[in-house]
């Protein structure tokens, strides 16, 4: 598929099924902890400065945000999880919204699950990965902020993440930096393969 990634726009934000776009376009969902770099990932992948708002305030994305890419596919930005300052009730609401989307959306082709290369995956990261494996949803692990770690230590950090996740070697694992754009081509290859 040829994609003009510059031709991208935020289409709509949705809280539940009735608000989802009603068409056949394939979707790739992006999930990860608050402040893992999801907005930066979207902006880097689409060569845009601030199509997705990067926020210093974690827990800002409270809806599913649908990004139209060249009228051929969509990114769906899922609310960041694991943010402590949000009430338990709010977290449960998000959980239901995310679960409804991930388990019922026919357009969904894969989930890009973002983890921070600098740290071991959190319990939430592990739970998300297990959830996706349980529902047999194709998953691409993207380890962000690779520029913050010396290249010589990438393998060590990658191994630690894979071990903690109980990573399935048939899934894609990509080291990514929105600063250096490392991993951008690999991420696109993995995404397009899933469409």
Curated annotation (Swiss-Prot):
Residues at which GTP binds: 32-39, 59-63, 77-80, 144-147, 176-178
Record-linked CDD domains: YihA_EngB (cd01876)
PROSITE patterns xrefs: G_ENGB
SUPFAM superfamilies linked to this entry: P-loop containing nucleoside triphosphate hydrolases
GO cellular component terms given for this protein: cytosol
Domain EngB-type G: 24-195
Phosphoprotein recorded as keyword: no
Membrane-spanning residues: none
Residues noted as binding Mg(2+) in the record, renumbered to the chain: 39, 61
Any single biological process term in GO: division septum assembly
Job description of the protein: Necessary for normal cell division and for the maintenance of normal septation.
Annotated family: Belongs to the TRAFAC class TrmE-Era-EngA-EngB-Septin-like GTPase superfamily. EngB GTPase family.
Protein's UniProt name: Probable GTP-binding protein EngB
Organism (species): Streptococcus pneumoniae serotype 4 (strain ATCC BAA-334 / TIGR4)
Recorded name of the encoding gene: engB
């Amino acid at each position: 598929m040829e994609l003009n990634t510059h031709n991208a726009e935020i289409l709509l934000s949705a809280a539940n099924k009735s608000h989802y776009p009603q068409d056949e376009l394939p979707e790739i969902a992006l999930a990860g902890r608050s402040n893992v770099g999801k907005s930066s990932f979207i902006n880097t992948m689409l060569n845009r400065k601030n199509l997705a708002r990067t926020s210093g305030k974690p827990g800002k994305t409270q809806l599913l945000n649908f990004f139209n890419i060249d009228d051929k596919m969509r990114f769906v930005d899922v609310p960041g999880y694991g943010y402590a300052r949000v009430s338990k009730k709010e977290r449960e609401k998000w959980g239901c919204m995310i679960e409804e989307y991930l388990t019922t959306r026919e357009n969904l082709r894969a989930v890009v699950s973002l983890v921070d290369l600098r740290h071991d995956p959190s319990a939430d990261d592990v739970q998300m990965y297990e959830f996706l494996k349980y529902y047999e949803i194709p998953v691409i692990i993207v380890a962000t902020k690779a520029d913050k770690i010396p290249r010589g230590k990438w393998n060590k950090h990658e191994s630690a993440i894979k071990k903690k996740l109980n990573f399935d070697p048939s899934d894609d694992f990509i080291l990514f930096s929105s600063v250096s754009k490392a991993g951008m081509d690999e991420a696109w290859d993995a995404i397009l393969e899933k469409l």
